[in-house]
C-alpha cells in the first residue's frame, strides 16, 4: 500500500516520499528508459518487483509489517500481501543505501529527458 511504503521510506531514510516523487526516470508513477543513478535504479527494481505480482493490487492492498530495532519485517498474509510488502521493504532499504549518491538534479526530472534505451527487468 502506498501509505505503508511511505512509512517504510521514512523509517529507512528519515525522509518523506517527496524527494523520491518524480525522481529520475523511474521514481514515482510509471517509469521508462534507463535509470539515471542508484536511487533511480532502486525505483526501477521496485517497478520490476511489482510487475511480477501484476495480479495483486500493489498500490492499495494493505499488508502486515513491523518496524523494530532498525529492521522492517513483513508479516503473514495472503501471497499477494506478502509479495507486495517484500517489494516495498527491499525498495526502502535500497533507497536508504543510495542516499549518499542522491542527486537533486534528478528531482522532478522530466520524462522527455529519459532517452537512453530501456532496460528489461
Swiss-Prot record:
Pfam families: Phospholip_A2_1 (PF00068)
GO cellular component, one term: extracellular region
Gene Ontology molecular function: calcium ion binding; calcium-dependent phospholipase A2 activity; phospholipid binding; toxin activity
Details of cofactor binding: Binds 1 Ca(2+) ion.
Tissues with expression: Expressed by the venom gland.
Coiled-coil positions: none
Official protein name in the record: Basic phospholipase A2 F17
Naturally occurring in which organism (per UniProt): Crotalus durissus terrificus
Amino acid at each position: 500500500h502506498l501509505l505503508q511504503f511511505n512509512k517504510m521510506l521514512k523509517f529507512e531514510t528519515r525522509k518523506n516520499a517527496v524527494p523520491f516523487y518524480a525522481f529520475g526516470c523511474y521514481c514515482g508513477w510509471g517509469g521508462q528508459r534507463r535509470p539515471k543513478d542508484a536511487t533511480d535504479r532502486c525505483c526501477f527494481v521496485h517497478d520490476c518487483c511489482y510487475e511480477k505480482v501484476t495480479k495483486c493490487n500493489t498500490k492499495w492492498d494493505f499488508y502486515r509489517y513491523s518496524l523494530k530495532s532498525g529492521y522492517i519485517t513483513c508479516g503473514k498474509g495472503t501471497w499477494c500481501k506478502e509479495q507486495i510488502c517484500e517489494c516495498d521493504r527491499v525498495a526502502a532499504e535500497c533507497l536508504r543505501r543510495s542516499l549518499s549518491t542522491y542527486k537533486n538534479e534528478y528531482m522532478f526530472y522530466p520524462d522527455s529527458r529519459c532517452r537512453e534505451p530501456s532496460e528489461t527487468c
